Regions:
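Short alpha-helical donor nucleotide-sugar binding micro-motif in glycosyltransferases
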Residues: 228-233
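A charged, aromatic-enriched C-terminal amphipathic alpha-helix characteristic of glycosyltransferases
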Residues: 291-295, 305-335
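A short, active-site helix/loop in glycosyltransferases that binds the activated sugar's phosphate group
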Residues: 101-130, 138, 142, 205
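Conserved donor-binding/catalytic core segment of Leloir-type glycosyltransferases
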Residues: 149-181, 194
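Nucleotide-activated donor-binding/catalytic signature segment of Leloir-type glycosyltransferases, i.e.
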Residues: 204-227
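A short, glycine- and acidic-residue-rich donor-binding loop in the catalytic cores
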Residues: 246-254, 259, 266-270
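Aromatic "clamp/platform" in nucleotide-sugar-dependent glycosyltransferases that forms part
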Residues: 241
Length: 337
């Protein structure tokens, strides 16, 4: 019975924790063991992002254990805007740790998207470890259009789901509000914006006062509640800047929720024309320029005019590329073959 070591043992509601839980559940269904102890003997070792247990990785490598490094994006927003010295140092240190594991310890590298792979190649150059792209996956039986929840008939509901829109990740929050405001001007029905993410109290108060559309802040939402939220909305707005491979977008697609966003990060890879609308950014996202919200709102209006077709397209896209079983098979090939 193969044993896979997975480090670090991330917890919470973020993408890394969600991925770990899905992977471990899939391995268990196949009768495989999972450990988080680097000292235990294992057939393969998966590093999700970074870990400070570098000595343990060295020991595992000397034992002949295959090390697979799963990479997300590179910390960059701290360079694009004024931030605290503590956040700047933390971001740079994390980048150096990831680059070290990728170059010195990994036997295989998994990039979450073509965008992520190309980004790492540009910033830190090629490495000896073979690399492959594996998109994130979701349980298509849980994230599904089937359910009791339906969008309101007398209003338009825009959905945003992120782990955090704070601590250096808040740039997408005014974009979400601006998109909702621009879309509301094109709608005959009232519009509301729902944001399921960590948002500071100050930001909540600000947008509650100055937004021209109603904004409901739901806070960090348990992952088991996300499918119902997605099913209850008309359209999803992708608020992350240069998203590497956003789980929330894939979850929305699986629930039949069309996605609206800008052509940055991995979004053009994930959201095909039949699954939503992706438009040119209209500036430089790496400099956090203000995007072309008007063009996106116009494109979203066309999606809402043919919502049943786009709902079906979103679900079809998820079924074709983002099933968790397909993701698991690809990881097993990298880990064990």
């Amino acid at each position: 019975m193969p044993r896979i070591c997975i480090v670090p043992r991330t917890e919470g509601v973020g993408g890394m924790a969600s991925f770990r839980l899905k992977l471990e559940a899939g391995l268990a269904r196949r009768g495989m063991e999972v450990t988080h102890d680097l000292a235990e003997k294992s057939d393969a070792l998966l590093v999700i992002g970074g870990t400070r247990e570098v000595r343990g990785l060295w020991r595992a490598k000397r034992r002949g254990t295959r090390i697979v490094h799963r990479l997300d994006g590179i910390n960059w927003a701290h360079r694009a805007r004024r931030t605290s010295p503590r956040l700047w140092l933390r971001s740079e240190s994390a980048n150096l740790l990831l680059a070290f594991i990728r170059r010195r310890l990994a036997d295989r590298v998994v990039y979450q998207s073509n965008f992520v792979r190309d980004w790492w190649m540009r910033r830190y150059g090629p490495v000896r470890a073979p690399g492959t792209v594996i998109y994130n996956g979701v349980d298509l039986g849980i994230y599904t259009p089937s359910g009791d929840e339906i969008p309101p008939a007398d209003s338009v509901r825009v959905m945003v789901v992120e782990g955090s829109l704070a601590d250096g990740q808040e740039a997408g929050l005014p974009w979400a509000v601006g998109f909702a405001e621009a879309l509301a001007q094109r709608m005959a029905s009232p519009l509301e914006l729902l944001i399921a993410a960590r948002v500071t109290a100050g930001q909540q108060a600000h947008w509650g006062k100055f937004s021209s559309v109603p904004v409901t802040f739901l806070g960090v939402t348990p992952r088991e509640e996300i499918p119902a939220l997605d099913r209850s909305a008309h359209i999803y707005f992708s608020a992350e800047v240069n998203p590497p491979c956003p789980n929330s977008v894939i979850e929305a697609l699986a629930c039949g929720l069309p996605v609206a966003g800008f052509a940055m990060g991995a979004l053009p890879e994930l959201v095909t024309p039949e699954a939503g609308c992706i438009v040119p950014y209209g500036g430089d996202p790496w400099k956090l320029d203000r995007p072309d919200l008007s063009s996106l709102a116009s494109a979203a209006t066309a999606v809402l005019a043919e919502l049943p077709r786009y709902r079906a397209g979103a679900r079809a896209r998820a079924e074709s590329a983002f099933g968790v079983e397909h993701m698991l098979e690809e990881y097993l090939q990298v880990l064990l073959d």
